[in-house]
Amino acid sequence: MKGIRIQGGMPLQGKVRIQGSKNATLPILAATLLTNEASYIQNCPRIEDVHRFVHLLRELGCMVHWQENGIRVQPGGRDDLPCERAEARRMRGEAITGMRSSLCLLGALLGRCGYVTMEHPGGCVIGDRPIDLHIHALEQMGVEFLEEDGLLSARAKNLHGARITLKFPSVGATENILLAAVKATGDTVITGAALEPEVIALCEFLTACGASIEGIGSPELIIHGGEDLHGTRYTVPTDRIVAGTYLFGCIGCGGSVLLNQAPWRQMEAVTVAAERMGAQCTVSEEGLFVQAPGRPKSIGHLQTGPYPEFPTDLQSAAMAVLTMAEGISCIEENIFENRFRIAEPLKGMGAEIVLKDGRHAVITGVEHLRGSRMEACELRGGAALVLAGLAAEGESFVTGQHFIERGYENICRDLRELGARIISV
């Protein structure tokens, strides 16, 4: 059976390059649909989710090519772009249902074509993850929705600006509004917009294409719609979640690691948590340098939240490390209600974890975990199980590798560069 074999107990030492950001790349690829000119997106990670998104763009009629470490997208340049024909906008299949980020095609195709039909997007099984915020916001912009036979249809006869207040700073909803608003008639104001760096990256790309957006990086965005957009070159920032994963790997195993080109300015909540666990984090022109003792300290209370708070995507990695910390820690999950799924496999390794409800986990650190056979059921939890295996005594084997490959270019190669005994088999 395909999986990842790990011989644990080795400290991590050395330097690893951090890949481009998955969560920035995907909405930017969607945004390339808003112009007829070619765009070149540099520093794209070669991960499963990006390959799936490229497949979707090609199905819509775009010419998409990998060039060195980037992707060239040519959506127009022909008399009739197929995505402007209704039959080509019925998006189905694993690329849609297996990837939550496919939802950003909703705003992009409404902005370009005014109509789209797609299966409900999927992704990792970590809660209900409703799309009501997206639908309610776009309805205010003149979009009509119809749900039938598992398909979501959206049509906008007159896509127009609106004043939209988000009751929660949803990254996906903010991105979908942005993608639709830059092509809408009039101005759109988003109050309560998400502050995540990936939203800022999308705004930067759109403005590089000629869009007019005020308030970038703030909770209120003003989009002046109706601008003609053009192609551009843009470099995707590095992935703060991948950097955080390897940071926690270093803390769990002990050692010293240079996270080359890590976006440390976007990782303050993560480095604060790391230092509470006993690590030392130092920034330089090269990136983020992490030194960790042999055994981490308990953190007391750690809660996830929207940026700039501690990211939910690193909660599982933190849990894996805290199972080996001195003392008792409590994790409070405030984004998704079902993100403690790795607790059971960790307990199978000897961890002491008590789940109070779907939101709280109390962890009493043990001195050592023991190697085990585990199954990854989602992206970030799968990566966290790899970290647990690295720190455990003996051999571990993690199946469900395809989940991990959705977000990590080559986690085994990267960790081997740091001295880990890990191989994909």
Indicate where each model-derived feature is located.
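Short, structured segments at the rim of ligand-binding sites
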Residues: 1-425
